[in-house]
Regions:
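Radical SAM [4Fe-4S] cluster-binding motif and immediate context
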Residues: 195-367, 388
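Aromatic/hydrophobic pocket-lining residues that form the small-molecule binding cavity
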Residues: 61, 118, 165, 259, ...
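Catalytic cores of alpha/beta
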Residues: 145-151, 316, 377-391
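Conserved strand-turn element in the central/C-terminal portion of the radical SAM core barrel
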Residues: 84-87, 335-345, 357-382, 402-407, ...
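C-terminal accessory regions of radical SAM enzymes
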Residues: 2-55, 218, 366, 381-451
Length: 451
């Protein structure tokens, strides 16, 4: 048996954006590695990668690759991140031609924003290589009824897919239900896939000054998040099974020993200049956070992390700084406390967040604040309050996006049922459903400008 773990190309057409730039640029999709797959106009173009276009590491795909390699042998497992490579469709199919006789199973991770594109590609792949058994993973697997008419699909995997991939390789097909790694299994599993072709293909601009360091290693120190934000996809559909937000969610953290060996190997082999912990929430609890700081203090390179404002003691931020952390991303979502509590269900005190952001900055670290607009039940006035909050807090940098509605997250189910965990979330005439947060944001910008 043999399997190809693929993150295929995802290109749109060439466009220009009024008020931004006149030269047409390619619309490029980001799929595996992104919690909310989206498209945007990039400097990259087919077969010509721009080194500083945002590109995340495809985490689930990378872990599943090495897990399969351990079980069935490296010679029977293939990996290719065509988005990281900025590969054209022509080059992608040329590569498939070189391995077609070695491949039995073909795995693609997908989600609603990319599914229309991906299914067309799957039909083309199946037409050219009819012996391929197509496996679909990713958040799209949480709603298998959307895929059951697709005769080209051999198996649909729910959740993170190391163990479920092996079930298919051992003969199972159809819908494969959740089977997550236990904490012990996770810490005994191999580290994710890196090689000489892909190691320098991942990049993020923020938090500053991360963009000045290259190459960047994007990694996880944990899986999952105990919080239940309405729009968050992975904790609800990949590292857990909680589409309505009414079940207990947990975080599984990698051990200090696992992470020390992992990071040490990456730095030694690929000479990474910085580490970005792209966890759902890196700093859940002081012990794990301090453990990671002790590791990074040994390696003496700058690092960055995806954090929450209130999940560690105040003094732990200084420990992070002293171990080389130069910046963090903090999800705030809205500048209106009612929206944060009753729609998002984040329960993050905005006044405390303002205080902690100023403290983090006083240490010499940057803070990249992330906000979302167009939540169900959110008013235009609420959105303008978010704008005001951003101006008052003075984050180093800010990310503003439209709220993406992607399968697996509670937001996706809101139009089907009332969800008690999100009492103020409602589908009304003000709410716009959209799976691509980038495109939704551009529509909202025009709307807010007219207020």
């Amino acid at each position: 048996m043999s399997i190809f773990f693929s993150n295929p190309p995802w290109w749109g057409g060439k466009e220009s954006r009024k008020g931004w730039f006149k030269r047409k640029r390619w619309r490029r999709g980001i799929r595996a590695g992104s919690r909310w797959p989206f498209t945007s106009l990039n400097k990259s173009r087919p077969d010509k990668r721009h080194i500083k276009d945002y590109t995340p590491y495809p985490y689930f795909l990378g872990y599943a690759t090495t897990y399969a390699q351990r079980k069935i042998g490296k010679n029977h497992v293939f990996f290719r991140d065509s988005i990281g490579l900025s590969e054209s469709y022509k080059s992608y199919f040329n590569f498939l031609d070189t391995i077609k006789n070695k491949i039995e199973y073909f795995l693609l991770e997908s989600a609603t924003p990319s599914w229309e594109h991906d299914y067309k590609l799957i039909k083309e792949i199946k037409g050219k290589y009819p012996h391929f058994k197509i496996i679909i993973a990713g958040s799209i697997g949480s709603v298998p009824e959307k895929l059951q008419h697709c005769k080209e699909i051999h198996a649909i995997l729910k959740g993170e897919y190391e163990k479920n991939t092996l079930k298919v390789l051992n003969g199972e097909k159809g819908i494969i239900d959740y089977d997550l790694l236990t904490l012990d299994e996770m810490n005994q599993s191999p580290t994710p896939y890196f090689d000489d072709l892909h190691f320098d293909k991942y990049f993020d601009w923020n938090p500053v000054p991360m963009s000045k360091y290259f190459p960047q290693a994007h990694i996880w120190g944990s899986r999952g998040c105990p919080f239940k934000c309405i729009f968050c996809v992975w904790p609800a559909s990949m590292t857990g099974n909680d589409p309505d937000g009414d079940k207990k969610r947990t975080v599984r953290q990698y051990t200090k020993e696992y992470m020390k060996n992992f990071i040490g190997t990456l730095i030694e082999k690929y000479k990474y200049q910085t580490i970005f912990f792209d966890d759902d929430t890196f700093n859940i609890g002081n012990k794990h956070t301090v453990d990671m700081c002790e590791i990074m203090n040994e390696f003496k390179i700058p690092w960055f992390a995806m954090c929450r404002a209130d999940s560690i003691r105040k003094e732990t931020w200084k420990i992070m700084h002293d171990s080389g952390c130069q910046g963090v991303k903090i999800g705030v979502e809205s500048g209106n406390q009612y929206v944060v509590d009753k729609i998002v269900n984040k329960h993050l005190d905005l006044n405390y967040t303002k205080e902690i952001v100023q403290y983090i900055k006083s240490l010499g670290m940057s803070v990249h604040g992330t906000f979302t607009y167009g939540l169900p039940g959110e008013t235009k006035a609420n959105m303008l309050e978010t704008k005001k909050y951003i101006s008052e807090v003075k984050f180093t940098t800010v990310q503003e996006s439209g709220t993406a509605e992607i399968e697996g997250a509670p937001l996706y189910n809101l139009n089907k049922k009332d969800l008690s965990v999100y009492p103020a979330a409602k589908i009304d005439s003000e709410y716009t459903r959209h799976a691509d947060g980038s495109k939704k944001w551009m529509d909202l910008v025009e709307s807010l400008q007219n207020k």
